[in-house]
Swiss-Prot record:
Keywords of this entry: Allergen, Cytoplasm, NAD, Oxidoreductase
Marked site positions, Transition state stabilizer: N148
Family: Belongs to the aldehyde dehydrogenase family.
A GO cellular component entry from the record: cytoplasm
SUPFAM superfamilies the UniProt entry points to: ALDH-like (SSF53720)
Known catalytic reactions: an aldehyde + NAD(+) + H2O = a carboxylate + NADH + 2 H(+)
Annotated protein name in UniProt: Aldehyde dehydrogenase
UniProt cross-references to Gene3D superfamilies, sorted A to Z: Aldehyde Dehydrogenase, Chain A, domain 1, Aldehyde Dehydrogenase, Chain A, domain 2
InterPro entries given in the database record: Ald_DH/histidinol_DH, Ald_DH_C, Ald_DH_CS_CYS, Ald_DH_CS_GLU, Ald_DH_N, Aldehyde_DH_dom
Pathway terms, separated by semicolons: Alcohol metabolism; ethanol degradation; acetate from ethanol: step 2/2
Record GO terms (molecular function): aldehyde dehydrogenase (NAD+) activity
PANTHER family the record matches: ALDEHYDE DEHYDROGENASE-RELATED
C-alpha cells in the first residue's frame, strides 16, 4: 500500500500518502523497505513510509531528466506561473489538513502551522508564480556588425534536501524558485517529517503539473541524500540543514559532476537589547526569537546580549515571560511550544543543558523535561556564561538561550560577531543611528531591528561565514536556479581577409 488512513482532532479521518512520489504517482520503493514516522508528542508510531535508496534516486532523477528534456522545457513561463499559483490556491484551500499533518509528525502547534507556516508557504509559491514570466535577458550592443543577446536558462535537474523543522515551508522555499525558472526537481524530505510533503504532492497532481516535473522521496541522508549529492545527472543541489552535513554535500558535489550548490546552514544568532529599547516590546521579540518553533530554527536568537543598565530588570521580566509560554499538546488551542522533533534531538538538547550546568552557567528558568511522555523541554535561560562555553558557541537547536550583559556599542558588535556563523541577528533600540550602525557592523545575512523572525518570501535569506552559500527567497533565490548564456551573432561580411 502507498497510503494509510490517519486522523487528527482538526481534520477527522484523511488519506495520507506514504509512497515515493515519482512521475506524478505514489510508488513503492524498489527494495520494498519502509521506516516508521514517530509522533513526537506521544512517542508512538504514526505510520510507515517508503524508504528510498540509491535505486529510487536513479528512477526519480531519470523521471526529472525526461520531463526537463521533454514538454516542460517548452512550457511557457506564463503557464509555469499559473501552475504555481494554482498550487498556492490549493495550499490555502487545504490549510487545516496541511497544518494538522505538520502538528502530527513535527510537533509544532496546529495554530502556528495554520496561521504562519501554511500561509507563508502559499505566499512563497504565489510570489514565484509571479516571477515566472518576468525572468528576462537583454541585448548588448558591442559593434555595428554584431548582434548579442543574453539568455537566462534553467539549470536542469535540481536535487533539493529539506530539513524537519519547517517541513512544508522549506518545501515551498525550494520548489517555488526552481519551478518558476523552468527546472525539474527531485526533493528529499527529512525522514522525521515526510507527511506534509506527500500531502502537497497530492495537490501537485490536482494542480495539473506534468509527470516528472516535481518528484518527492523519503529516505535517510546517508543513503538517499548522499546519492543525490553525488549523482552525475543532477545539475544542482540545494540543502537546508546542519553545517556538518553541508560540508559533506559540498564535497560530494565537487567530487561528482561539480554540480552547483546552495546551502542554508546553522546559526548562533545574537539578539541585542540596548538600554533605550522599549522593554515590553524587546521582551516580546526576544521571547519569540528563541522559543518560536520550540527553538528549532536556524536563525533563532539564542545569544541574548542586554546593556548593563537594564540587565537585572530585563532578565527578571524575561524569565517571567518565558515561564508563561504554553508547552504541550500541539492540537491544544493555547499551545505555543510543542515537543522537540525526535528522541535524538531531545537527548542532544538535554545534553547541552547538562553541559551548561557543568561549565558553571546559571539556569535562570527551565532546564528540565516537561512531563513524562513526548519530547517536551521547558523554556530554558542560562546566565553567567562566558564566550568560550559550548552553550554560547554551538548551535543547540532547542528552547535554550544564554543571556549576557554588555557595556558599549563597540563591545556588543565585537562579541556579537564572535561566532563561526552569520545567519541572523537583531538590534532593539529607539535610536535609529544605533540601529543602522550596529546592523551594518554585524556579519549576518539578516538583521532585524525591534523585531525577530519576521521573515518574508520577498526578502532574501541566507548566511555569512559558515551559515551557508547563496540566498533563499526574494528575487535573489532565482539566481540559484538559472544559468546565463551569451549568444553572439556576426552580421555582414567576413571580419578578416
Amino acid at each position: 500500500m502507498t497510503s494509510v488512513k490517519l486522523s487528527t482532532p482538526q481534520t477527522g479521518e484523511f488519506e495520507q500518502p506514504t509512497g515515493l512520489f515519482i512521475n506524478n504517482e505514489f510508488v513503492k520503493a524498489v527494495d520494498g523497505k519502509t521506516f516508521d514516522v514517530i509522533n513526537p508528542s506521544t512517542e508512538e508510531v504514526i505510520c510507515s513510509v517508503q524508504e528510498a535508496t540509491e535505486k529510487d534516486v536513479d528512477i526519480a532523477v531519470a523521471a526529472a531528466r525526461k520531463a526537463f528534456n521533454g514538454p516542460w522545457r517548452k512550457e511557457t513561463p506564463e503557464n509555469r506561473g499559473k501552475l504555481l499559483n494554482k498550487l498556492a490556491d490549493l495550499f490555502e484551500k487545504n490549510a487545516d489538513l496541511i497544518a494538522a499533518v505538520e502538528a502530527l509528525d513535527n510537533g509544532k502547534a496546529f495554530s502556528m502551522a495554520k496561521n504562519v507556516d501554511v500561509p507563508a508557504a502559499a505566499g512563497c509559491l504565489r510570489y514565484y508564480g509571479g516571477w515566472a514570466d518576468k525572468i528576462e535577458g537583454k541585448v548588448v550592443d558591442t559593434a555595428p556588425d554584431s548582434f548579442n543577446y543574453i539568455r537566462k536558462e534553467p539549470i536542469g535537474v535540481c536535487g533539493q534536501i529539506i530539513p524537519w523543522n519547517f517541513p512544508i515551508l522549506m518545501w515551498s522555499w525550494k520548489i517555488g524558485p526552481a519551478i518558476a525558472t523552468g527546472n525539474t526537481v527531485v526533493l528529499k524530505t527529512a525522514e522525521q517529517t515526510p507527511l506534509s510533503a506527500y500531502i502537497a504532492c497530492k495537490l501537485i497532481q490536482e494542480a495539473g503539473f506534468p509527470p516528472g516535473v516535481i518528484n518527492v522521496i523519503t529516505g535517510f541522508g546517508k543513503i538517499a541524500g548522499a546519492a543525490m549529492s553525488a549523482h552525475m545527472d543532477i545539475d544542482k543541489i540545494a540543502f537546508t540543514g546542519s553545517t556538518v552535513v553541508g560540508r559533506q554535500i559540498m564535497k560530494s558535489a565537487a567530487g561528482s559532476n561539480l554540480k552547483k550548490v546552495t546551502l542554508e546552514l546553522g546559526g548562533k544568532s545574537p539578539n541585542i537589547v540596548f538600554a533605550d529599547a522599549d522593554l515590553d516590546e524587546a521582551i516580546h521579540w526576544v521571547n519569540f526569537g528563541i522559543y518560536f518553533n520550540h527553538g528549532q530554527a536556524c536563525c533563532a536568537g539564542s545569544r541574548i546580549y542586554v546593556q548593563e543598565e537594564i540587565y537585572d530588570k530585563f532578565i527578571q521580566r524575561f524569565k517571567e515571560r518565558a515561564a508563561q509560554n504554553a508547552v504541550g499538546d500541539p492540537f491544544a488551542a493555547d499551545t505555543f511550544q510543542g515537543p522537540q522533533v525526535s528522541q535524538l534531538q531531545f537527548d542532544r538538547i538535554m545534553g547541552y543543558i547538562e553541559e551548561g550546568k557543568k561549565s558553571g552557567a546559571t539556569i535562570e528558568t527551565g532546564g528540565n523535561r516537561k512531563g513524562d511522555k513526548g519530547y517536551f523541554i521547558e523554556p530554558t535561560i542560562f546566565s553567567n556564561v562566558t564566550e568560550d562555553m559550548k552553550i554560547q558557541q554551538e548551535e543547540i537547536f532547542g528552547p535554550v538561550c544564554t543571556i549576557s550583559k554588555f557595556k558599549t556599542k563597540a563591545d556588543v558588535i565585537k562579541i556579537g560577531n564572535n561566532t563561526t556563523y552569520g545567519l541572523a541577528a537583531a538590534v532593539h533600540t529607539s535610536n535609529l543611528t544605533t540601529a543602522i550602525e550596529v546592523a551594518n557592523a554585524l556579519r549576518a545575512g539578516t538583521v532585524w531591528v525591534n523585531s525577530y523572525n519576521t521573515l518574508h518570501w520577498q526578502l532574501p535569506f541566507g548566511g555569512y561565514k559558515e551559515s551557508g552559500i547563496g540566498r533563499e527567497l526574494g528575487e535573489a533565490a532565482l539566481d540559484n536556479y538559472i544559468q546565463t548564456k551569451t549568444v553572439s551573432i556576426r552580421l555582414g561580411d567576413v571580419l578578416f581577409g
